[in-house]
């Protein structure tokens, strides 16, 4: 049996692109092979603003948070997994799918399993960025080696993080690289595959997205119709208040999918490829891709469906102008995205997991 231990997050709760939904799909499609244990949302800590709040934080809050993260939260994971422990056999495999997050730690769970069930295989997925680990290892240089020790393999969703782990001293054979999945039953085109005039460009996501640079690109491309899906990020003041610019706050998944369906191009001005679900869902919805050439983006895209840019305003402007009026090129790129998205289906995640043992 393969046991999937996953964290539910408010930001992806109930949608068709998060880790929990991936687990739902695996359990539904392969019920005799997978079981899932879902950790509820972690406790959130409000920003400290007033003087009184700062005093309270120093007196009580800081210690309370430390105790929650180091004691309470790991204990909650152990309680969650009690039914699994009662049935665990040496041939079973455990997948920890939110690994290396100190504020939602699965490390203590990994150590407990390794100590009490030494023959059970443990695979731990991390979908963070090299920049994140740079910041964390500046505080704790042994962090990656420490967290890697109790698990059999570290899993990643892109070659850039795999390379980072290898350079950090993790043996190559202890790392396995896969892809972010896409739910192709949910993310599929409803509108005819055609190019719009003016060109419709959509931008989505908040993680590792450079809104300042995007705003400058928008200003230099006034003859493009822009759909800026900023989520809960308050960046409205950066963009021109003109009819060709639609600024959209948090959207229900169905509405976001519709906006992708009516667009031509997915523009991704990124500092890294964290949040790869934006890339994979864009491809499944048949969008031509303009992307920052960072992280693991070339694991997902190539020159047939994407234009790669350095993080430079003029490169993005040039890419957009290359597609404007070139309907044949846009159509070819859209078709290529659709075709490439087929290798990101849930069946391929299952094949990846099967090959690990």
Predicted features and spans:
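Conserved donor-binding/catalytic core segment of Leloir-type glycosyltransferases
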Residues: 193-209, 215-219, 227
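Acidic donor-binding loop of glycosyltransferase active sites
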Residues: 261-274, 287
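Conserved acidic donor-binding segment of nucleotide-sugar-dependent glycosyltransferases
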Residues: 303-314, 322-327
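A charged, aromatic-enriched C-terminal amphipathic alpha-helix characteristic of glycosyltransferases
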Residues: 13, 327-357
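Short acidic/histidine- and often glycine-rich active-site loop of Leloir-type glycosyltransferases
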Residues: 238, 294-308
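A short, active-site helix/loop in glycosyltransferases that binds the activated sugar's phosphate group
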Residues: 151-174
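Nucleotide-activated donor-binding/catalytic signature segment of Leloir-type glycosyltransferases, i.e.
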Residues: 230, 235-257
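Acidic anion/phosphate-binding donor-loop and adjacent secondary structure
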Residues: 134, 166, 179-198
